[in-house]
Amino acid sequence: MELNWKKTWMVLGLILVLGFGMRVYHLGNNAFVADEFLDMNSAYGYFKTGEWKAWDFNSGQSSQVNINEARDERANIYKWQVAELFRVLPPTEATARSVSVFWGVVSMLVVFWSTLVFTKRKEVALIATFLFAVSVAGIIFDRRLRMYAMFFPAYLAFATTV
């Protein structure tokens, strides 16, 4: 039985809702870990000052001694998105990580498209998308404040088109 496009879009929509729900569920319950602190400091510093400087939350100002200066300019496109989100939402763990959740949903769409390009089968593309949507590694990847959640769909889309 071959799926028509209407059913395909409906199933894909359900998979996207499921994947989004699994990524956003209790998103702000855990404190930042490892490099998430550095990205939050940099994004918040840009939000407050318009410059790529780490923010010192203890003193409430940009860091005077910026030992991570070179790192503050990494992944500016990603951290700019986080900083822009702070204009409309409070600067919390959930708000900052929601940029990665967004890119996780984009990743699901790119997985569907890429699989469809290579296999020409909607069923296989839906299965691949579902497996990525419920994958523990994919969920963890898309719940961290890290630029890699944005890079994954970009690289997969590029690799598919080349």
Predicted regions: what is each one?
Residues 2-162:
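Membrane-integral, polyisoprenol-dependent glycosyltransferases
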